[in-house]
Amino acid sequence: MQEFYSFSPIDENGNPFPFNSLRNKVVLIVNVASHCAFTPQYKELEYLYEKYKSHGLVIVAFPCGQFGNQEFEKDKEINKFCQDKYGVTFPILHKIRCNGQKQDPVYKFLKNSVSGKSGIKMIKWNFEKFVVDRNGKVVKRFSCMTRPLELCPIIEELLNQPPEEQI
């Protein structure tokens, strides 16, 4: 099985974003969309990023138009929207697919690591969240209904543990 740090998805400019650079970080991965009822979660995601980035949190957003076609077509439009409307400073990567035959390999890995409610692996909607510990282990998955600020306890717990002692 592939490990988390072996992935190198593409950023908005078409350049690799090597997950190897995320070693010893706590990572929150979110599939996002710009025209969704959950889009205001960007505000709380940015708050988390600003609060915890100096302690080792990285948030990585993957735009996806697979759920209700609620995302811009072009990566530049997505990034401009996120920066202008929500002041987003965390990485927003290239638009992907989360499910199906053309799903991004990162999402295949995440879904195989931790299932959703009732054991369902498929991503159900925008703004599902995966928390990855400092060792690259996917430790928890949260639905779109979970607000980002509700993740503070698990983020703090993982940030307070050295890499070799992660759960």
From Swiss-Prot:
Cellular component annotations (GO), alphabetically ordered: cytosol; mitochondrial outer membrane; peroxisomal matrix
Bilayer topology: Peripheral membrane protein
Record-linked InterPro entries: Glutathione_peroxidase, GPX_AS, GPX_CS, Thioredoxin-like_sf
UniProt keywords, alphabetically: Antioxidant, Disulfide bond, Membrane, Mitochondrion, Mitochondrion outer membrane, Oxidoreductase, Peroxidase, Peroxisome, Redox-active center
SUPFAM superfamilies: Thioredoxin-like
Induction notes from the record: By glucose starvation.
Location in or out of the cell: Peroxisome matrix; Mitochondrion outer membrane
Active site location: 36
E.C. number(s) listed in UniProt: 1.11.1.24, 1.11.1.9
Protein purpose: Glutathione peroxidase-like protein that protects cells from phospholipid hydroperoxides and nonphospholipid peroxides during oxidative stress. Has peroxidase activity using thioredoxin or glutathione as a reducing power. Involved in peroxisome formation.
Protein name: Glutathione peroxidase-like peroxiredoxin 1
Gene that this polypeptide is encoded by: GPX1
